[in-house]
Structure formats: C-alpha cells, structure tokens
A protein has these predicted regions:
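Outer-membrane beta-barrel transmembrane domain signature
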Residues: 31, 35-37, 48-62, 70, ...
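Extended, low-complexity, charged alpha-helical tracts
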Residues: 111-115
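Cleavable N-terminal export/targeting peptides
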Residues: 1-45
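Short Lys/Arg-enriched helix C-cap and helix-to-coil transition segments
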Residues: 108
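Conserved beta-strand in the GNAT
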Residues: 91
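N-terminal carbohydrate-binding/catalytic regions of secreted carbohydrate-active enzymes
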Residues: 79
Length: 223
C-alpha cells in the first residue's frame, strides 16, 4: 500500500506541474519503450540513454521490478534487461535503428540478444513504432531459443496503442505475452495511462482488469 501511495503522489505532482506547461498540437512520443528517433547533423554523433523500471504487482505471486537500459548512437542500439524473460535472468542486446516518414513516422530496430541466468539462450528480437497525428503504436518482441531445453523456447511480446490528447498525457491499450508469471490468459490485455514531464515518463498499466488484475507501474528517464 505504501508503494501505491508513493506512486499516486508522484503522478499527482507531475500531472499538476505538467498542466502549467504550454501545450501544442504536435504529437509527442511518450512510450517508455520507444527507440529514440534518428536525427541529422551533430545529434547523430551523440549518445542518448534511457533507463526504465517496471514494478509488477501480480496476484497470487511475488512482486518484482524489471529494469531496462538503452543506449543509442547514430544507428547503433544497445540494450540491457533484467527480469524480462524470466526472474533472475538478464539479457544483452545489439541492433540497428531505422526510421523515416513525416506525417506517418516510423522506426524499426532489429536486434540480436543473449539471455543468461535462470534462463539461457539466444534471442532475435525487434522494436518498432508508428506515429500519426496524436496516435502512436509501439511494439517489441523476441523469440528465445532456450539452449538448455528447446521445449522452453518462447515468444515474448509487448505492444501499446496510445492517444495523446495533450503533449504530457497519453491513454490507451496494451497487450503482452510472457511466461515469467502464470495467468489464465496466453495473451494479456489491459489499459494504460501515462504522463510525461521534461525527461521523466510515468505510466500505470492494468492487465486482465476483469479477472485477477495485474498492476504495473513504470518510471523512465531519458538523458
């Protein structure tokens, strides 16, 4: 309960501050899992970093935190995750960023990763996004080829479709497929509400809201 209270206070404070900022009609990418867009000039030579932590409150199971760190320079994309494929399991990734478009902007990053810990394997994966008007689709996925037992190989995916009515707020739907914890659904569905202020993103998710809902609270920082 203390964790939920602290998160609620943080969201309230950021939301009140964000309301005081001027808004525009231009859509802003606020998804915590999005890949930084490719830009021209000197910006392409600079590193950009993003760190996030997802706190999972799973019914009839243990709570856990899933951190992710990304680093991008020019087209190069590097990423590290923990507690994503399985608990007590890390993964390291390398990929290349592609992107383009104006009214319909797109990004796509094919990746290859190594998984180590309680689960070990090789994983081809991807991240991608589409942005149009105030709508954004973000998706990522990977297939883990388990090197200990081929029967444990698995496809993981996470996708979000969100609408940003103002530049600091987004609402939408989310789906995921994971074997990190058990539910009655192979593909979990839910809703999201996110706010952004400067370099900070805060997002709340609820999966399976009609049957033993799982709550996820995410915080992200770009630098």
């Amino acid at each position: 309960m203390r964790l939920l209270a602290l998160i609620a206070v943080a969201i309230f404070l950021v939301a009140n501050t964000a309301r005081a900022q001027p808004t525009t009609n231009a859509p802003v990418s606020t998804a915590t899992n999005s890949t930084p867009a490719l830009t021209g000039g000197a910006d392409e030579k600079a590193w950009s970093f993003y760190a996030s932590a997802y706190t999972y409150l799973v019914p009839d199971s243990r709570e856990y935190v899933q951190p992710t760190f990304t680093a991008d320079r020019d087209g190069l994309h590097l990423e590290a995750r923990y507690n994503y494929e399985a608990l007590n399991t890390g993964s390291a990734w390398a990929g290349y960023n592609f992107g383009g478009g104006e009214k319909l902007a797109w990004e796509f990053t094919p990746m290859l990763g190594g998984v180590f810990g309680d689960t070990t394997g090789i994983a081809p994966g991807y991240k991608g996004s589409l942005r149009w008007w105030k709508l954004e689709l973000d998706t990522e996925g990977e297939y883990v080829f388990d090197t200990r037992s081929s029967s444990d190989s698995f496809f993981y995916t996470w996708s979000e479709l969100s609408l940003a009515p103002v530049d600091w707020l987004r609402i939408g739907a989310v789906v995921q497929r994971t074997k990190l914890y058990k539910t009655d659904f192979d593909i979990q569905r839910g809703f999201l509400v996110g706010i952004s202020f400067k370099r900070v993103d805060l997002t709340a998710y609820v999966f399976n809201p009609d049957d033993k809902p799982t709550f996820v609270f995410a915080v992200g920082l770009s630098f």
